[in-house]
A protein has these predicted regions:
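Gly/Ser/Thr-enriched, mixed-charge loops and adjacent short helices
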Residues: 26, 39, 128-254
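Gly/Ser/Thr-rich active-site loops/lids in small-molecule metabolic enzymes
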Residues: 141, 223-225, 277-296, 329, ...
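An N-terminal, well-structured beta->alpha segment
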Residues: 17-89, 113-114, 166-197
């Protein structure tokens, strides 16, 4: 494979490439790894949303699609975004409550020149966010977000004449998205199995798409929390194992073939096997990456440095190549596009199927797992049993000074991999410390074959972050 000059090889293993981060999120004040986020009416205000609407209409002429999740503050922000777009002369197609991938797919398939989704994804209910979408359905890249922030800060917006303000239209993005998902899977193979599926929409936007996808696939669906409620009364929005205990219990009680859980905007999906066991997001990523490499007779898989080594193991063994990027779906999608990758995704349940959409897609992930179960004629527990076993632990530490943390990490770990944050590799595991792009926290990941060792690495990472942020000068030796 020809490696473009911007690719920086730092790993001696053949078929493994790392890409250095091209623009630091630290250079931007408002835009993080997933647009602009903050606590509604405190950090993210109506005034800011209005200006963001003016910003996107100043950057992209013509029709702009606007959608939102189920959060209580989303209608307020949607109104402000639309007002800003109209004032700058842009037209709006209002698609209402819709998952992020549904909005993105709609923009790709329609005449819209851009999109805006109002969502804070998996963040707590008091948060909300605003994210821009290109006309090919991809999220704005870091460079595009930086450009948007410059326009926003300058206040040099377009301003329409009284008879040139935009108009508002409406359309059904969810119907178009559902049809798009169905076209990309083997419907007859899935339908013949008559799978029993327990679906937990988490009171989010998946309520308007995933049940209908399962219906089209002839699945018998047992629904949990599949009604819109921006208070998220049943569980926290993030579909991690500790939040979806009810899903696990229902899968066992009804003897279902599969359990599926979504986050607030349904760009992610996590899974429970037929025994009621949670299947880790990295294992699902590895399973699907292996499938796509085998199906294509090789190819490139793109994933962030935070992903489990099990992904690399199965991809290389199947004859594929792995490209590691910084954390964040926009950069993963961008590199997938540039390298014609066969598959990509993050180890948080966000999988990217390039034949459908270069963006994370929880609904498509659900359909593709069912398809794999059908064509292989195996339950999920059997499909994942040969994926290499690693122990990964994740945690987060409050971090109000991200610049100080990064400077401290560079000082203490000179030989670390700084693709995104600091990844320190040991003979028997690795540790990643990176400031979040959406919250005032530092995320810490540790992985090893041995559970005890993984926990030791995690504890070391937490201790190191706290010492750097407190200004404690002692350097802890660890190997």
């Amino acid at each position: 494979m020809d490696i473009p000059q911007k690719f920086f090889r730092i790993d001696p293993i053949e078929n493994v490439i790392y890409i250095i981060r091209e623009i630091s999120i630290m250079e931007r004040k408002l835009f993080g790894t997933n647009g602009v986020r903050g606590i509604a009416n405190e950090e993210l205000t109506v005034e800011l949303a209005l200006d963001l609407g003016k910003t996107i209409a100043s950057l992209r002429e013509g029709l702009i699609a606007v959608g939102m999740d189920t959060r209580l503050s989303s209608p307020m922000f949607k109104s402000a975004i639309i007002a800003g777009i109209l004032s700058a002369g842009g037209d709006v197609v209002d698609v209402g409550i819709t998952p992020t991938p549904s909005l993105q797919y709609y923009v790709k398939e329609s005449k819209a020149n851009a999109g805006v989704i109002i969502t804070a994804s998996h963040n707590p209910r008091e948060y909300n966010g605003i994210k821009f979408v290109n006309n090919d359905g991809t999220e704005f890249t870091w460079e595009q977000d930086a450009e948007a922030e410059r326009v926003l800060m300058s206040k040099l917006f377009k301003k329409a004449h009284w008879n040139g303000v935009g108009r508002v239209y409406e359309d059904d993005a969810n119907r178009i998205y559902i049809e798009g998902v169905i076209r990309k899977v083997d419907v007859s193979a899935i339908a013949d199995k008559e799978f029993k599926v327990v679906l937990d929409c988490g009171n989010g936007a998946a309520t308007f798409t995933s049940p209908f996808i399962l219906k089209e696939l002839n699945c018998k669906t047992f629904s949990i929390n599949c009604y819109p409620d921006g208070r998220f009364p049943a569980r926290q929005s993030e579909p991690v194992e500790e939040n979806i205990w009810e899903l696990k219990e229902v899968v066992k009680s009804v003897k279902a073939n599969l359990g599926v859980a979504h986050d607030g905007d349904a760009d992610r999906a996590t899974f429970v096997d037929e025994k009621g066991n949670f299947v880790s997001e990295d294992v699902i990523l590895a399973l699907m990456a292996k499938h796509y490499v085998e199906k294509n007779g090789g190819g490139i898989v793109v994933t962030p440095v935070s992903s489990s080594k099990c992904v690399e193991d199965v991809v290389v063994e199947a004859g594929g190549k792995v490209i590691y990027t910084a954390v964040g779906s926009p950069v993963v999608a961008k590199v997938m596009m540039e390298t014609n990758a066969v598959f990509g995704g993050e180890g948080n349940g966000g999988l990217i199927f390039p034949e459908h959409l270069l963006a994370r897609d929880g609904g498509m992930s659900m359909a593709k797992i069912l398809e794999l179960m059908a064509i292989e004629n195996k339950p999920l527990s059997e499909l994942v049993k040969d994926i290499p076993k690693y122990h990964m632990f994740k945690t987060k530490v409050e971090c109000r000074d991200k610049k100080k943390l990064l400077e401290g990490l560079r000082s203490e770990f000179e030989n670390a991999n700084f693709t995104d944050g600091a990844r320190i590799d040991f003979e028997d595991g690795w540790l990643l410390i990176r400031p979040s792009g959406t919250e005032p926290i530092a995320r810490i990941f540790a992985e090893a074959k041995n559970e005890k060792r993984a926990k030791e690495l995690l504890e070391f990472g937490v201790e190191k972050v706290k010492k750097i942020l407190s200004g404690y000068s002692e350097i802890t030796k660890f190997s």
